[in-house]
Structures are given as C-alpha cells and as structure tokens.
C-alpha cells in the first residue's frame, strides 16, 4: 500500500492573473523573480502614476522581508547574490539579476498567453522600466502591503 507523503509547501503566497471569473496561477521558475516582481507590484500599487525606475540596490531589506514572508527564509543573502556585479574572476556580470528579470518576462508572458491576454501591462521591458498595469488592478494581501 503506498504511503501518503505530505505535500511540500514551497511558498505561502501565490500570484494569480485574474479576469472576471477566470484566474490562472503564475508559475514562477525562480524564487528571486517572484520576490522581485512583488517589489515592482508594490511600487506600482503604492506610487500609482508616480512609479518610476527602481534603484534595486535600495530594496535589500524589503526583498529579505518578502522572501521571509513568502518562503519562510531570510532572503537578504539571495538578494546580495543576485545583485553581484563581479564574479570570482573579477569580471563584470549581473547574471543573477538578468536571470530573475528574464524569468519574470517568461513566466508572466506564458501565463498571459494561456489566458489570451496581452502581456504588455504586466511585464517589464528591462531593468529601467516599470509596470504599466493600473494600480487599482493590483490586489495584494494586507500583510504583504504592510512590509513596504
């Protein structure tokens, strides 16, 4: 008789794309991508039309708090790793940040495709852009909003 294994919880929060009565969960391929996207969502929700390019280096503490809330792990070390500008050979790189941003584009884009929605307002073109989705369309739990 097969034994029942407990369901492994990998995250305490999920992101859904919702249209009227239809919703699809966004499957983030990278944890850093999900947390980074939450930061962009919080920025857009709180600043509205005044949302602008984020200086990500200023978001280490928020990244850590969000990572802890979502995954139950302090994420400041993950942020530091993601933001490294140089590798062990002292060569310029930002592979971690690039990978996180690419995962956001890919993961949000594929969810929008499955829902037959244009991805434009929900994705980031590059590190210098901000989300175009209307702030009133962003619904985040109070405990996430309180961290900002």
Q: What do the predicted segments below correspond to?
A:
Residues 1-148:
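Intrinsically disordered, low-complexity protein-interaction/activation regions
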């Amino acid at each position: 008789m097969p034994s029942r294994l407990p369901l492994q919880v990998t995250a305490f929060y999920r992101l859904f794309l919702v249209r009227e009565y239809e919703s699809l969960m966004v499957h983030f391929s990278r944890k850093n991508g999900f947390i980074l996207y939450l930061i962009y969502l919080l920025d857009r929700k709180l600043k509205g039309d005044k949302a602008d390019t984020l200086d990500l280096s200023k978001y280490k503490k928020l990244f850590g708090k969000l990572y802890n809330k979502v995954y139950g792990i302090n994420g400041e070390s993950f942020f530091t790793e993601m933001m490294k500008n140089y590798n062990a050979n002292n060569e310029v790189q930002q592979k971690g940040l690039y990978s996180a941003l690419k995962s956001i584009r890919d993961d949000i884009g594929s969810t929008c495709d499955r829902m037959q929605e244009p991805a434009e307002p929900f994705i980031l073109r590059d590190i210098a852009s901000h989300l175009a989705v209307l702030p009133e369309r962003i619904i985040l739990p109070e405990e996430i909003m309180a961290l900002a």
